[in-house]
UniProtKB/Swiss-Prot annotation:
Keywords: Autophagy, Mitochondrion, Transit peptide. SUPFAM superfamilies: Dimeric alpha+beta barrel. Disruption phenotype: Morpholino knockdown of the protein causes impaired mitophagy. The lineage of its organism: Eukaryota, Metazoa, Chordata, Craniata, Vertebrata. It is found in: Mitochondrion matrix. The keyword Transit peptide applies. It comes from Danio rerio (Zebrafish). The gene is nipsnap1. This is Protein NipSnap homolog 1.
Length: 279
């Protein structure tokens, strides 16, 4: 009986000691938020507090471009007619110098939400350019007729106003036959700057095959949303390019620190529409 009691007593003593150590570490961690001990390393990497809006800290200073992304869910029986009508109207707006806007890209979703069109517009001059463009469109009888006709074809639509990350290249027209992937991330509120800090270092791992098209974050619409736009020759090329990134030292660290910042993520594989500057 005595032989059994002594090991149990020893185990209880060891457990009591470990509990005290753990309690001390926890107290220390919560009492001193600036201390980066072992507990804080279990969570997202900390960044310094900022005293400015993330739109000023993360966007490009030398340009004042504003972007708008549109998601149109089309009635299946109208998909072909919708594409043809959009092609005609967007082409005119894109080439009309009287309107301070241009189509960056237009796509149909291939994998993801079906019977969907995605349009990305750029407004050179920021919010004043957007306001001026909308004012002129509301006076354009041809556009108003298009909008009325288009409304019959849609199930729903939504849009977001975006700024581009300073460390991404600005989207430029592409020739050839490509597929595009739009990866959208809903971040935890307050983590946009941290996301930008990590991706500013990580983007170098994803540029060797010219796959990086553009990176954006929302200003109006769904907030704390990030969109990364990628181009690949085909799905097999996408698979090989993404796999190659994991072989580069440092990419895994970037993924490790950005994953805890994400609430939700979504991937769309998209096919360019006929008039899209990004082909």
């Amino acid at each position: 009986m005595m032989a059994t009691a002594r090991p149990l007593q020893l185990l209880n003593t060891q457990q009591h000691f470990l509990n005290n150590v753990l309690a001390a570490w926890l107290a220390r961690g919560f009492a001193n938020k600036s201390d980066e001990g072992w507990l804080s390393s279990m969570f997202a990497h900390k960044v310094d507090a900022r005293k400015d809006a993330h739109s000023n800290l993360l966007s490009k200073k030398e340009t004042s471009n504003l972007y708008k992304i549109q998601f149109h869910n089309v009635k299946p029986e109208y998909m072909e007619e919708y594409n043809k009508l959009s092609d005609e109207v967007q082409k005119e707006l894109h080439h009309d110098t009287d309107y301070p806007c241009e189509v960056v890209g237009s796509w149909n979703t291939w994998y993801g939400e079906q019977d969907q069109a995605v349009h990305l517009w750029r407004y050179s001059g920021g919010y004043p350019a957007l306001t001026e463009c909308l004012r002129k469109l509301n006076l354009n009888t041809a556009y108003l007729a298009f909008r009325k006709e288009r409304s019959k074809m849609l199930l729903s639509r939504r849009n977001q106003l975006l700024l581009e990350f300073s460390f991404w290249n600005e989207p430029v027209p592409r020739s050839g036959s490509n597929i595009y992937e739009l990866r959208s991330y809903q971040l935890l509120p307050g983590t946009m700057i941290e996301w930008g800090n990590h991706w500013a270092r990580a983007i170098k791992y994803r540029q060797e095959n010219n796959e990086a098209v553009g990176g954006f974050f929302t200003q109006i619409g769904d907030l704390y949303v990030v969109h990364h736009l990628w181009a690949y020759k085909d799905l097999q090329s996408r698979e090989e390019t993404r796999k190659a990134a994991w072989e580069k030292e440092g990419w895994d660290v970037s993924v490790h620190y950005t994953m805890p910042l994400i609430q939700k993520m979504e991937s769309r594989i998209m096919i360019p529409m006929v008039h899209s500057p990004l082909q």
